[in-house]
Regions:
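Helical element adjacent to the flavin cofactor pocket in flavoenzyme catalytic cores
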Residues: 66-123, 127, 131-134
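Flavin-dependent oxidoreductases
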Residues: 103-206
Length: 206
C-alpha cells in the first residue's frame, strides 16, 4: 500500500484517501468486524454510532458503522498505464493483442508461445485476471478452482446528486456470497457510482 502511494505521488497520479464506512443496523455485526480489525492491528479503524456516522455522511441513516481511514480511491487505469510506462522506461517490453497458447519450461526458463511469437523469461507472473486459471493450467499448475465470470453493472448519479455522498459507503458483505454488495463510491473526479449488481456472463470476454 505505501509503495503504491509513493508511486502515485512520484507519477503525479491523482487519488484520494479519505476513508470509508461499512454500515449495518446490527450493532453486534459492526462490533464483530471491529474486533477483526483490532486483531489485524489496523490502525485508526473504529466503530461509529449514529451521530458519528452523520458527521461523515449526513445522508446515511444507519445505526452503526465501521470507519476505515486507510481506504481511498484512484483511477486504476491511470495507475496501470503509468506502471507500463515505467516498465518500458526501465528496458521492459509490453506486447499487446497476443493470446498465450502454450507454456513450457526449458533450461530454467519459462517459454511462452502466443498466436504470434514466443517469449522466454526466468520468471512468469500470472496476473491474467479472469484468465488466470487458464494461464495456470497452461503452466501445468492445477489451481483447484475455476473462475466463473460475472459482470458488474453500476449506476452513475447525476452531478446534481453528487453532494449526497462524501466518500465511500459499503454494506457488510455476506460471507456466504462472493460479492461485496451494493456500495456507493465517490471517484477522484467527484462522480458517484452505485453498484455493482452481479450478472452471470456467458464468456470471460463479457
Amino acid at each position: 500500500r505505501e509503495l503504491l502511494i509513493d508511486f502515485m505521488n512520484a507519477e503525479n497520479i491523482p487519488y484520494r484517501i479519505e476513508g470509508k464506512i461499512v454500515v449495518d443496523n446490527d450493532i453486534e455485526k459492526i462490533a464483530e468486524l471491529n474486533k477483526r480489525a483490532e486483531d489485524l492491528n489496523m490502525s485508526g479503524v473504529k466503530a461509529l454510532e449514529r451521530n458519528e456516522i452523520l458527521d461523515l455522511e449526513p445522508n446515511c441513516k444507519f445505526k452503526s458503522a465501521l470507519y476505515v481511514p486507510q481506504a481511498g480511491v484512484v483511477d486504476y487505469k491511470v495507475v496501470t498505464e503509468a506502471i507500463a510506462k515505467k516498465f518500458v522506461s526501465l528496458g521492459g517490453t509490453v506486447e499487446y493483442f497476443q493470446k498465450i497458447k502454450n507454456i513450457n519450461s526449458q533450461n530454467d526458463l519459462k517459454v511462452l508461445t502466443s498466436d504470434k511469437e514466443s517469449f522466454s523469461s526466468e520468471y512468469l507472473i500470472n496476473c491474467a485476471g479472469l484468465f488466470s486459471d487458464t494461464v495456470a493450467i497452461l503452466d501445468n499448475i492445477n489451481p483447484n478452482l475455476r473462475i466463473i465470470p460475472f459482470r458488474g453493472e453500476y449506476y452513475v448519479l447525476s452531478k446534481q446528486k453528487s453532494h449526497l455522498v462524501n466518500n465511500m459507503i459499503y454494506p457488510i458483505s455476506d460471507p456466504n456470497l462472493p460479492f461485496l454488495g451494493i456500495h456507493l463510491t465517490k471517484n477522484v473526479d467527484g462522480q458517484i457510482e452505485a453498484g455493482p449488481n452481479a450478472v452471470l456472463a456467458f464468456a470471460k470476454e463479457g
